[in-house]
């Protein structure tokens, strides 16, 4: 069945791409195709080979996380499934159009229509960062040998004014909770390795109580907790910490993650398999726009999120466009 779209939660503010994205230049030399691993006993040689790839260099975040060391040890994502729920994805982009790149049961359309090109841009960019093809063209993702299980949902957009969600016993979140629990359960039932959630409600987790969060999202918490599984077998859920720093001039407190990213701070059964991700610049310092780990420091990681080059959905036959985005989604 086509999943029922959730009632427009406010996503993390989508960044604006740099002007007029252009197709990536053809690299000067051919490299091993997607899925190929250089078999060698020489770790340094393998690491150097990956680092010399034009695709590796184009995605500047790879060097910061030392991805080449993982690749040289054979950790390329093979055998894993990454789950992404976003407003749409361009499955025909050259970074995502591999024969088995998207699972056949991915949900690429809404219940009533297909996503527009604009609606597919954020999810396309995020997906290619995670697992874009290593095919001697453009850039490649962190786990380039992984598969993608994608769910398209309608999302609202963050406005110029920061608007913290009202979450307490006076607000009925039953419909939202029903939808989110159903959607997140698709990932759990699929046995997805890790799920990226680049959306959520604005508002510092410090401003909410455990009681209010449990009252609003009981079914979603139950699904995310996966109480019937050992910790090592659970699907991991990674949430954008939020871009509250971009609203600092409005007096916004971005010292801790927003609602979804901060869930494990308040909900103990989510601490083994849920975490927030903050953004750092390429020099390793935290990005000015990013929420901080704060009270959720024990359930929080950092990743490059400033000016990250990745796939860009475009209404053009080439499907080979790229752009830079910034944000904790990246």
Spans of features found by a protein language model:
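Structural signal for conserved beta-strand scaffold positions within catalytic alpha/beta enzyme cores
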Residues: 102-104, 150-152, 239, 276-278, ...
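Glycine-centered loop/turn positions within well-structured domains
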Residues: 137, 246, 306
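Glycine/charged-rich beta-loop-alpha catalytic/anionic-binding loops adjacent to active sites
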Residues: 103-113, 313, 317-320
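Ser/Thr/Gly/Pro-rich low-complexity, disordered linker/stalk segments of secreted
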Residues: 1-36, 40
